[in-house]
Amino acid sequence: TSGRLSSSGKFNAQQIPRDNPIIKGCIKAPPGYKIVSQDLATAEMYYAAVLSADKNLQAVFTSGGDFHSTIAHMVFNLPCKVEDVKELYSAERQSAKAISFGILYGSGAKKVAETVSKAAGIEYPLEQAQEDINAYFTKFSKLKKWLKDRKEFIEANGYTYSFFGRKRRLPNVFSSDKGIASHEVRSGINAEVQSLASDVNLFGAIATANEVKFKKLDAKIFMLVHDSIVALVADKDVEEYCEILKRNTQKNLGCSIQGCPIGVDQEIGEDYAFGKFEKVYTLEGDKLSRIPSRE
């Protein structure tokens, strides 16, 4: 397990395809209500910055700019403004993005090269990927040290603890199969980060539910999906509910970057697809057709 909440039964909310608006669009609010969803923004990297105490990585969040553009700008010393990185240096931004998401899962140069080549539509050499990873860890040296320290601890002990003290046993680190042992180590490191994000989300949901009950708002949280909280809220209470949820999620529980609480993204709509169904599909008579992409 990764330390996140799990879901099972006839309605397994966590197995709803994330990018399928047909299925998500079936979850609709009744008249007079809205579905409100809140996601933690770039949660895994935010909490990696917290746990590693890497000031350079924390500075990326306090800067307030696009995360991946800021990372690329810092790592590759790009001669442009951060806001222009996405347009002028898309390959470098894709590289920074692939490394950021990959390091917590133990991705090496080969995986980074494949990811960037596919995303940017260019040939991205293995040697370049390794150079970029080296440059990344030169800039974020404390993150590198934290990853190394956690790896050594897990390999030596066969367990790890979440930020709030839950023990995750990892017996397969002692496997004679190096592939299994390596996967177990990666799972342990990833669990430390994901469990913290999940716990913060859960504490925020509990505090919000209690405050909603106290204030007698017509709102009910009906599912938590990884880093998101989804609720059914009466139209008259949507604005207040959103403020309460954001405030409770961003409370400092001892795991926040100073002066920069975790970011949140909120969506409000008639259904769980939040209008994406209408952007992707059209109904002509009884026939459902996909709208051609303009990209």
Q: How would you describe each model-predicted region?
A:
Residues 105-150:
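Extended, well-ordered alpha-helical scaffold/bundle regions in very large, multi-domain proteins
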Residues 270-295:
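Acidic, low-complexity intrinsically disordered tails
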Residues 95-104:
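Short, amphipathic alpha-helical "recognition" segments used to contact nucleic acids or chromatin
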Residues 39-40, 109-111, 115, 132, ...:
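Catalytic palm active-site di-aspartate
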